[in-house]
């Protein structure tokens, strides 16, 4: 599984990168070659005035692609929640293909 992490207006620390890799490998690693790649996009505070909320979007490339996203101030917590949601979405997409 190829993992790409893109960050805009958010510091991508080594700890956050390691956390992302660990959580996504744990959640999606079991799907093997059915998952082509995973793209994670992190972006800084949004323009609607919320205090420091950051956006995380995870796109899992397979047929069809699975996309989950959420906004929260704690990126570590968002990654935890979204990795599980992405895994459920991939499971559902694979079951629909059968």
Each PLM stretch: what is its role?
Residues 1-98:
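N-terminal, polar/charged subdomain of small-to-medium soluble alpha/beta proteins
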